[in-house]
C-alpha cells in the first residue's frame, strides 16, 4: 500500500499496475502484504529482492548511509517529498542484516522507544511519513538515547520522515540524519527498464526528448510510471510494426492518462451512444463484444437515460462502435483496447468529468460483477479494478470528494458485494496516500446515526475495522465503540461485537483495551465515556462455545476483576441510556455462566456485587445501581411462585441478599456476606 513508488518499488502485485490487457489486481493479497508489514512481520525475502532489483544509488551516498548506521545504529532518512526513502532504508539495512528486516509496529501518533525492539541482529524501519507535520519535538534526542540499546542487540533502525518536521524535531541530532536527494531520473528509468523482466533496451527511450522532458526533475514514483508505460508499449508492439515516434507518443499520452486524447474524443462524440459504449468497454475490457454492447444500454439506463429500443439494424453495430473507440475484436470475439492503460484512463476521465454520476456508475459496476454473460476472470477482477481506480482517484484528490467516492462505492457494494466492500475499506485505510484521511473519515462515519450512514455500510466498516485492528488496535477500538454507540441495527451490533471479541482474543491487546476503556470512562468528553460503556457492553455480551463470557478468560486475576467491576458499575450507573436488550443479554450470559460453570460462580457474583457496592472503597450505598441490577436479575430469573425455586432463582436471591446485607444503612443479619 506504500504509494511512494521509488526506484526500487516493484511489489509482486501492485495496486498501481495498469497492465496492457487490464487484467486487474489481487487486492486481497495487497491487504495481507500491508497488514503483515505494518504489524512487524519479517519482510518476505523475495519481496525485498524484487524491491531492490531496480534500486540505483550513487556509491558516495551508499557509503554515507552505511557510515551513519555503523556509527550510531540509527539512521534518519528525510526528504521533502518522494525521493525513495523507503528503498534507501531497505538497501542500507539489507547491507547490515540481510533479509532480517521488520517494520516497527506502531500506531500513528503513538509514543516510540527503541527499547521495545528486542530482536537481535534485526533491521527496523520506523515510518513517520504518515505523521505529516506532527512529529514530537524531542524525537531526535530520543533516537540518540536509543542507540546504545540497538547496539547491544546488534540491530539497526532506519527512520523515514519529511524534512521540515525533522528539522524542528532533530534538536541537534543531525548527525543521525541524511537528506535524500532525487536520484538522476535517467538512471532510474534505465534501471527499471533493464532490470525488470521482460528487459527493455533503454538507450532509445532515454534518447527521446519527449521522454527526458517528461521525467526531468521527477521523483522515482513518476519515473517508475514512465518505465511501466514504456514496457507496456513494447509488449503491445512485439512485431515492431509501429514507428518509434508513434510509440513515444502513446507512452506520453498514457503517462498523462490520455486526458488530451479523451477530451478531443468526447468533444467529437457528444452522443451518449458512443460515450456509453466506450465506458462499458473500459469497465468490461476482455468481455465478449455482444456483452459489452448490451451493457452499454444498461449503463445508459443506470445513468438516468432512456435509450430508444433498437429494432433490427437500427443504430450503430459493434463493428462501427468498436472502431469509433479505437478498440478491436479478438479471434474469440472479446473486446480489447489497442492503447496502453486506455480503459483505466477512460474511467478516470468519467469520474473527473461527471462526478455527479459516480454513485450511479458504481452501482452499475457492482451489478456487472453478477453478469452471467461475463467470463469468470473478468467478473472476478472487476471489483479489484474498481478498487484500484478509486484509490488512484483518492490519491489525486484531497478534498471531501475523495472520501465521498469511497463512501459511495462501499455503500453500493455493502448490499450486493459485502466482502468487496470490506476489502475496499480496508485497503484504503492502509494505503500510504489515502490512509490518514480515510481513517479520519471512518471515525466521522462511525459517529453518525443509522439514518445518515446506512447500517449495511456500518456493518462493512465494522468488519474492516476488525481486520485493521491487527495493526491499529487503539484507533480501531475507538471507531468500533463509536459505531456501537450510534446504531440500533442488530447486524451492526453483531459485527461490532465480533470485531471487539477478535481484538480481545489477542493477548497482547487485552491490557491496551483495559487501559483505553479506563481512560475513556474517566474522560471529560461525554462521547468518550459513552464509547467506553458500549465497548465493554459488547464484550460482556460475547461468550465462547461452552457459554463462558469472553471477558472471564482471566477472571481470577485481581487486575482483571477490578477492571470488570469498574466497567459493570458504569453499565449499571448508565442503565437507562444503554441498549436494553444488549445489556440484558450481557447480564444473562454472566449469570448463566455462574449457574452452569462452578469455577465462574464466585468471580461472577463477586464482580456484580462489588459493581453495586464495595465496603472497602464506597462511602455511600448506591441504590440506583442496586435497582438496575435487581431489574436485570429478575428479567433473567423471573419469580415462579407455583413451582419450587429454580437454580437460577436461588442464585438470583443469593446475590440480592448479599447486596442487601452490604447496605450500611441496614443492620447486618447473622450469616455470610458474599465478597466481604
Region annotations inferred by a language model:
Residues 1-43, 490:
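Long, low-complexity intrinsically disordered regions enriched in small/polar
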Residues 257-264, 269, 284-420, 439:
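C-terminal leucine-rich, beta-strand-based interaction scaffolds used for sensing/assembly
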Residues 168-172, 188-255:
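Amphipathic alpha-helical "lid/sensor" segments that cap RecA-like P-loop NTPase cores
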Residues 72-88:
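Walker A/P-loop nucleotide-binding motif
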Residues 98-156, 161-162:
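Conserved P-loop NTPase "ATPase switch" module shared by AAA+ and STAND
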Residues 85-101, 256:
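P-loop NTPase Walker A phosphate-binding motif
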Residues 374-575:
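Extended amphipathic alpha-helical coiled-coil/heptad-repeat regions
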Residues 37-66:
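N-terminal pre-Walker A segment at the start of P-loop NTPase domains
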